Regions:
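Non-catalytic accessory regions of SAM-dependent methyltransferases
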Residues: 1-41, 45-46
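Residue-level signal for inorganic ion chemistry
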Residues: 28, 66, 96, 123, ...
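Conserved AdoMet
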Residues: 30-106
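Active-site beta-alpha loop architecture of Rossmann-like, nucleotide-cofactor-dependent enzymes
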Residues: 70, 188-191, 244
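Conserved SAM/SAH cofactor-binding pocket of Class I
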Residues: 95-195
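Mobile active-site "lid"/loop adjacent to the S-adenosyl-L-methionine
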Residues: 187-219
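Conserved Class I SAM-dependent methyltransferase catalytic core
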Residues: 213-276
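Conserved small/polar residues in nucleotide/adenosyl-binding loops
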Residues: 279-282
Length: 282
């Protein structure tokens, strides 16, 4: 019997549902304490040193405070790659993996791509790795996020240019010319805070999460306006969105001058992505 795994699940009881507690137990045993996965599933126990016992108690205390396991590990997986994450950046989500996979099916292998609000760099770096002939630029307002993204890019040997930009105030210059702009900007309204889990609300950066209730599309609107000047004719916008504002986002983009605007659902059947084209006069 794996006494250590049972102990972990028991300590997490009441804070996490049984399935999540079991998953956390496996991660702790295999990824932190070094147990072989096959031994874990065979129910073999781990002999812990005093130092490992202390480390385990520290981890359990952090989990008791709902700190995400990705921050405890210092990393998260995204499309088969490992990205460093800290509380200064959002933890990459499966929905964002869907967005990148969609882009990879649709984009030219030689594209000029801008990722607005790059965070850990997971979108920009993944695109740069899968489309090595493309030129990928990534913006973020947070210097801490850019530092983490640049470290991820170096570790994964990706070619991405990182720039500190506040998209709400930035004015484009002649050099800003892109075939594709992608963004997963802040989109959670203040009113939605009460619905959020503690591990998100208490730990992930509010700068990357929230928008005012009075203007939930503020980032999408600004990026769309910038796109009018920065996108080539036939250029594309890709947005990950709040499922509550799909139709509003589509309407805003149509009013701004974009064409072929489409609203797409994620694997959970929620409105999650908006894609559109820009056609400009010669």
């Amino acid at each position: 019997m794996n006494i250590t795994a049972s102990y972990i699940r028991r300590k997490l009881q009441g804070r996490y549902d049984p399935r999540e507690a079991g998953n956390l137990s496996r991660i702790i045993c295999c990824e932190i304490l070094g147990q072989q996965t096959v031994d874990y599933y065979l129910g073999k126990d781990i002999i812990l040193s005093v130092k490992e016992e202390q480390e385990l108690e520290s981890i359990l205390a952090r989990l008791h405070n709902f700190e995400p396991i990705q921050y405890i590990l210092g990393e998260a997986r995204f499309l088969g790659r490992t990205f460093r994450v800290t509380p200064g950046v959002l933890i990459p989500r499966p929905e964002t993996e869907e967005l990148v996979e969609m882009m990879l099916k649709e984009l030219s292998p030689v594209s000029r791509v801008l990722d607005v609000g790059t965070g850990s760099g997971c979108i920009a770096i993944s695109l740069a790795k899968e489309l090595p002939e493309s030129q990928v630029t990534a913006w973020d307002v947070s210097g801490e996020a850019l530092s983490i993204a640049a470290a991820n890019s170096k570790a994964l040997q990706a070619s991405v240019r990182f720039e500190q930009r506040d998209v709400l105030t930035y004015e484009p210059c002649v050099a800003d010319c892109y075939d594709v702009i992608v963004s997963n900007p802040p989109y959670v309204t203040e009113a939605e805070k009460q619905e959020m889990e503690h591990n998100v609300l208490d730990w992930e950066p509010s700068l990357a999460l929230f928008v005012p209730d009075t203007d939930p599309l503020r980032f999408y609107r600004r990026i769309a306006v910038l796109g009018l000047e920065m996108l080539t004719s036939g250029g594309k916008l890709y947005f990950e969105i709040n499922r509550a504002f799909g139709k509003d986002t589509v309407a805003m983009l149509c009013e701004t001058g974009y064409r072929a605007v489409r609203l797409q659902k994620d694997i959970s059947h929620n409105d999650r992505f908006v894609i559109c084209l820009l056609y400009t006069s010669p």
